[in-house]
Design a protein with these regions (language model features):
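Surface-exposed interaction/gating patches
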Residues: 42, 137-215
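C-terminal functional regions that serve as terminal interaction/effector modules
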Residues: 31-34, 180, 184, 200-260
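Anionic, Ser/Thr-rich low-complexity intrinsically disordered regions
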Residues: 8-9, 29-32, 50, 160
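A short, compositionally biased domain-edge/stem linker segment
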Residues: 19-28, 139-145
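Short, cationic motifs built from Arg/Lys/His that form the positively charged side of catalytic pockets
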Residues: 3-4, 39, 158
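Short, glycine- and small/hydrophobic-rich beta-strand elements in well-ordered beta-sheets
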Residues: 21-32, 61-86, 92, 179-207, ...
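Hydrophobic, ordered structural segments
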Residues: 41-52, 58-66, 70-147, 162-164, ...
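N-terminal secretory signal peptides and thylakoid transit peptides that target proteins
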Residues: 1-14
Length: 260
């Protein structure tokens, strides 16, 4: 190899190494993103719902806190048409998510406090079924945020489905680098989380949750959002066309013992 070729090759290799090191440095500087499990406990109104709430409050949530899940959110439908409970569990890592159930089973205090429910007979189950989805938090909202603990607070849970992985990825980009999350923040629409659904129903999709002081604040914030020039520009950007094929919107209220 001639000296000139050698120097050229060496410079390219060095540049590649620097780029790689730069990427590693950026990754190291970026905040660790949480893994978010969103559960729906299917229950009947009345005694079954009450028993599940007691179990969550007195046994499951304290045990989850001991297992490293620092904050657990528990919610029910504002319109009360369904008795189901929605539970949000943020994990520090995918390994923490995988280990959570084993840690609970090994927790003697959990076994003691929840014995009646954990050992419930088939004729009187604690719940009908659990539906669960696993999400990875967005770059623009890497961790669950708890900024509002007012008794009147209202949560809004929204899921955006896409007809392809490529369009789903583009919608996530619209939130992150496109500025939609930043727009929410500017307009006082406080995020709880934004997550890309990795496993669950109706994928590909993303799901996010916002919190408002009350229903009046919810309506006023969305009115501001729809009229904002930045949103008008963003929604008409052709690169984000046809990124959403279906939207699910649910208004929730927190349980008295919810940590979110």
């Amino acid at each position: 190899m001639q000296r000139r070729d050698f120097l050229g090759t060496t410079c390219l290799a060095g540049a590649a190494a620097l780029t790689s090191l730069g990427d590693v440095a950026k990754a190291a500087d970026a905040p660790a993103k949480e893994w978010l499990e969103l559960r729906t406990y299917k229950v009947e109104a009345g005694a079954m719902r009450t028993r599940l709430e007691t179990f969550l409050r007195d046994a499951a949530i304290p045990a989850l806190n001991r297992a490293g899940v620092a904050t657990v959110g528990v919610f029910s439908a504002m319109d009360e048409k369904s008795a189901d409970l929605t539970v949000l569990l943020p994990y520090k890592s995918i390994e923490a998510f995988a280990a959570a159930s084993r840690r609970l089973l090994a927790d003697t205090e959990y076994q003691r406090a929840g014995a009646e429910c954990l050992n419930a007979p088939k004729t009187a189950p604690l719940y009908t079924r659990i539906e669960s989805s696993l999400m990875l938090a967005f770059d623009s909202a890497p961790k669950v945020e708890i900024a509002n603990k007012k008794a009147s607070r209202v949560f809004q849970l929204r899921t955006y489905e896409s007809h392809s992985d490529a369009k789903a990825r583009k919608k996530i980009e619209m939130f992150n680098t496109g500025g939609e999350v930043a727009l929410f923040r500017r307009l006082g629409m406080q995020p709880v989380f934004f997550g890309e659904t990795i496993a669950g129903a109706k994928i590909p999709n993303l799901t996010y949750m916002l919190v408002f002081d009350d229903m009046d604040a919810n309506k006023a914030a969305w009115d501001r959002f729809m009229k904002d020039p930045e949103w008008t520009k963003l929604k008409n950007d052709p690169q984000y066309a046809d990124t959403v094929s279906a939207i699910t919107n649910t208004l929730l209220k927190p349980a008295a013992f919810s940590q979110i």
